[in-house]
């Protein structure tokens, strides 16, 4: 039994994520758990399941190894910069395109909102838990057998399936998110996480990226409730396409370097 679980460890966990979240969200709907427990608990339960799984298959060393990417901080500053500005840049591009489409001044759409310190801390904690579960474990494990890009897209499917009950409940997430748009956006999010992680092996960079995603969604008028569903969908599409562009450019650059190296050797 242990050998079977160890062999299919990451797939077992990916399947468990959306399955476990359904009764957890239902418990919130029925009022069995409070809002505060639900908000962070939905992430904590994933980490708890993962730690239990790793203890069973790998022991304490497996759990310690799970958090190792969070110790990697010595990476080129460009990756920190990309993680810092990428989400907000996509949001600004979306709003500029919106203003062009409606033929109005950009200032009519671009506005930045602030929230409480408690909310910012919550966004950071959620980003941390998400980074450990979805990136430091899922994407890293899948990348051992398949290319990081494909690993990110596979994780995006299960990540979105995990989010669907949360979206339907509409608590602890942006209200009125179209599920199809959520899928598109999560493909972009997971793809960017895989891109950053594959180049840095740094959980800190991914944590910064995900924190900025959360801040961007609440700071700029791109949510369905304050920007409209089409704005959110456009944001998700641009995020996804830009992610594809970065992966494509990276492939071409690496392929070109490989060809030049082969020519030098010949």
Regions found by a protein language model. Name each.
Residues 10-14, 79-80, 137, 151-152, ...:
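Alpha-helical transmembrane segments and their helix-entry boundary regions
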